[in-house]
Amino acid sequence: MAEFPASLLILNGKSTDNLPLREAIMLLREEGMTIHVRVTWEKGDAVRFVEEARKLGVATVIAGGGDGTINEVSTALIQCEGDDIPALGILPLGTANDFATSVGIPEALDKALKLAIAGNAIAIDMAQVNKQTCFINMATGGFGTRITTETPEKLKAALGGVSYIIHGLMRMDTLQPDRCEIRGENFHWQGDALVIGIGNGRQAGGGQQLCPNALINDGLLQLRIFTGDEIIPTLVSTLKSDEDNPNIIEGASSWFDIQAPHEITFNLDGEPLSGQNFHIEILPAALRCRLPPDCPLLR
């Protein structure tokens, strides 16, 4: 095997007992690859490990976990200054793995690990909310956010992405739309939103294609709003084709401003952020990510 620069894997603490992962790492090490492994225990560990990765001079920092882990590692990488910033590698080990799935990361651990180490590094966008919090995949608001943040961990562990749908059906009687106003470049909408998706990536909530036209290197955010007064009829209508769906509002812009008369919550790659005012903007070519050559989210 050709020689590859060293990499550092930042592994979510929930995946430490993953025997196939241990075996995959050992095999690659036996083939001559240098792979450092660090395990997260609490919030902020990823920043510290990225700093260590730079001191070690690795070419890639691999995020081993779900969308939240990818978010934390990618956010730490874009905060780095200077040259020779490591590329991001992705090893999907979470419940839903929405970003990894949509960009075409292999499900097989050994193949995903090889791609994370040796794949082509391509500049991709990220998004930033209120000049502080970032997301690499999607910001979701409304019905979808409450479901993904409230779904019990045991249900997610047992059923994966399907758990979000099941929990949503159980909660329909208590969920109401969010009234808000959204502005962007050549875009303005005001009304009641059941679901809001602002995507750099395409899917969230365990495989739901909220922003099917999103690309991760076009300098734009894709917006999709699901409107309606009643949740069940709206969800039924969303199963139809987009052309027949009167409850979908779409837009594209490098930024969006959201204002609400009451507190609403957005889910940023799994992390909730509540408030009444949100400014969401794209950060073009914010970091390099090792992706498959046929990644469908590249223009």
UniProtKB/Swiss-Prot annotation:
It is an enzyme of class 2 (transferase). Binds 1 Mg(2+) ion per subunit. Ca(2+) may be able to substitute. Its cofactor is Mg(2+); Ca(2+). Its EC number is 2.7.1.-. It comes from the Bacteria. InterPro entries: ATP-NAD_kinase_N (IPR017438), Diacylglycerol/lipid_kinase (IPR005218), Diacylglycerol_kinase_cat_dom (IPR001206), Lip_kinase_YegS (IPR022433), Lipid_Phosphate_FormReg (IPR050187), NAD/diacylglycerol_kinase_sf (IPR016064), YegS/DAGK_C (IPR045540). GO terms for biological process: phospholipid biosynthetic process. GO terms for molecular function: ATP binding; lipid kinase activity; magnesium ion binding. The active site is at residue 271. ATP binds at residues 40, 66-72, 95. Residues 2-133 form the DAGKc domain. GO terms for cellular component: cytoplasm; plasma membrane. It is found in: Cytoplasm. Probably phosphorylates lipids; the in vivo substrate is unknown. PANTHER family: LIPID KINASE YEGS, SPHINGOSINE KINASE. Belongs to the diacylglycerol/lipid kinase family. YegS lipid kinase subfamily. This is Probable lipid kinase YegS. It comes from Escherichia coli O127:H6 (strain E2348/69 / EPEC).
